[in-house]
Amino acid sequence: MSTFLQSFKISQASDEYKQRRKTQMLKFFTASAITILTSRFAYRSTIARQYVPTLFQGNHSPPLSYNFTTDAAVAVATGTILCGSVSSMLVLGGFWILDVSNLGEFGWRMKEKLGGLEKEKHLGEMEMDEESRYIQDSLNDLLDGKYDFEEEGGNNSVA
């Protein structure tokens, strides 16, 4: 466990930090409530569509008034709503646990945890070979508008 988490006391936290955590908690609980409501809706719509035959009817064939298109549309819509609500609950719960407010901060935290900052510094300090430097300079000249296509004499092939 990091020293930050061991020495952290909520009484010493700033009001901005407390408000941020409260917002994260409310987002998670809202997503959880939506997940519960959509799962209840899915359960009830499934029970309502259930075919219950009468005493001497076969249970292997649906009634003639059955509409497969409507049933498929309701199933797809219900599944999509359930998938979206559960996914949002998982993402917002993970953000609350990791104390992350947006995707940019999540990317920065993951880069820090996986050692990306040190690797990026190491790559930045490495010497660039001549071909890479030529390509980089050519692209920079092209983006800056310094490259003149007519000077080449119509020869656009790469050497």
Swiss-Prot record:
<keyword id="KW-1133">Transmembrane helix</keyword>
<keyword id="KW-0472">Membrane</keyword>
<comment type="similarity">
    <text>Belongs to the AIM11 family.</text>
</comment>
<dbReference type="GO" id="GO:0005739">
    <property type="term" value="C:mitochondrion"/>
</dbReference>
<keyword id="KW-0812">Transmembrane</keyword>
<dbReference type="GO" id="GO:0016020">
    <property type="term" value="C:membrane"/>
</dbReference>
<feature type="transmembrane region" description="Helical">
    <location>
        <begin position="25"/>
        <end position="43"/>
    </location>
</feature>
<feature type="transmembrane region" description="Helical">
    <location>
        <begin position="74"/>
        <end position="98"/>
    </location>
</feature>
<dbReference type="InterPro" id="IPR038814">
    <property type="entry name" value="AIM11"/>
</dbReference>
<protein>
    <recommendedName>
        <fullName>Altered inheritance of mitochondria protein 11</fullName>
    </recommendedName>
</protein>
